[in-house]
Each structure stands twice: as structure tokens, then as C-alpha cells.
Amino acid sequence: MLKFAMTLTLLVKFAIAALALSLLSACGTPYASVANRAGEPVMLLGYDPVAYFTVGAPTKGNAQFKTNLPDRTYYFASAENQALFAANPTKYEPQYGGFCASGAAFAIKLGSDPTAWQIYNRRLFIFGDVLGQTAWQLDPAWNVDHADKLWPSIAAKGWRAASLQAYAFKVPHYKTGAQIKSEYELKNPSKPWPSYDPGGMVKNLFSKQPGWRSAEGFGQAAQGYPD
């Protein structure tokens, strides 16, 4: 009976992986972008990537100042910021395609909230929500190390496919939400774990785009979709 159950589990995992592979080219862009009215794949819900460094705060960009790169478009708050970006895009682009830096440590391309961010070692990291940011801050170096190693293998994959594969075949260092919460509570006995509903796998992987919670105000202030 145990052998049968193990075989069934493996079959289910292979079925999920096969589905994920079929989605690689059709479902989910490789970047955490959302389409504007013109159909352009806008990053950071239209927030200015340069302003995180120059202003130290999330700052809305303007479609008047935009730069189109392969598979992604950035808005800027000013022509000056646009010029800074043009001179050195690598310096200002968010890490891991703008996906949640916490999820990237487990090969998951999920979530993007431009108001949940951190600059660490001169690199911009974006998180899917307050839970992802809180988890990442437990050990930034650990998360960056694992994400940097995994990212080359998933960078070109659509976000749905990459995430489905990651859930089906978890990396050896995978941690559940409960495990991360337990680590947090041990390190921060006087601070409660953030109360936040991430929205569920169906919405996050199938019916919504990266950044939908931030854009639509799901449990937080609505940032809106880019024009």
C-alpha cells in the first residue's frame, strides 16, 4: 500500500511537471510585468526603478518617460531618471525579474509588490507582499545566495510554469510557510508575524497577474494598474 501511494505521488508530480512544461511558452511571462492599455509589459506596476536608489522610496513613474526592453517596459518619474537607467540598466533593474526575492530562493516566480522592497548590497529586491519581505529579512544573505544560484535555471521560464515546477519538485532547502513563521517567532518573540492573506495558489498562478494584490488592494492599499 505504501509503495502504491509513493508511486501515485510520483505520477502526480510528473503530471504537474508535464503541465508546467506545456505552459512554458504560452502562460506567464518571464518577468513580473502587467500589461498597460497599449499592451506593453510594464514592470513594477509603473513605479520608477531608479527612484528606489535616488529617493529611497517607491515613486510612481510616468508613461511619458518610458523605456522598452525585451519583454519589459519601465516608467520613470523624470527624464533624468530615465537617462540614469539608460546609462546602466543593470544597476537599477530589480533582481529576479521583479518577482518576489523570497520566493526566488526556492525557484518560485510569484508575486510582485513595488511597495515591498529593499536595497541590499546595492541591489534592488522586490517582494510579493509583507509576508515575503518579512521572511526574506530573517536572513538576506541566505536568501540571496540561494536565489542567485537558482535564477539562471528559471530566468527565461514563464512565471506560471516555473512556479508549478518548483511546487512539484521542491528544492532541497525548501521551507514551508509554517517553518518560516516558526523561525520568525523564535527570533522575534515580542513581534507578531504579519497578518496577511496571500490570496491562494489558484488566484496567484492562474486567474491573476503578478502584482495583482498590490494593484487591486487585496489586503492593502490599491496601487492600481499602469496606464
Annotate each predicted stretch with a short phrase.
Residues 69-78:
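Short, well-structured hydrophobic secondary-structure segments
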Residues 27-70, 91-227:
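Intrinsically disordered, low-complexity terminal tails and linkers in eukaryotic proteins, enriched
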Residues 5, 11-25:
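Bacterial N-terminal signal peptides
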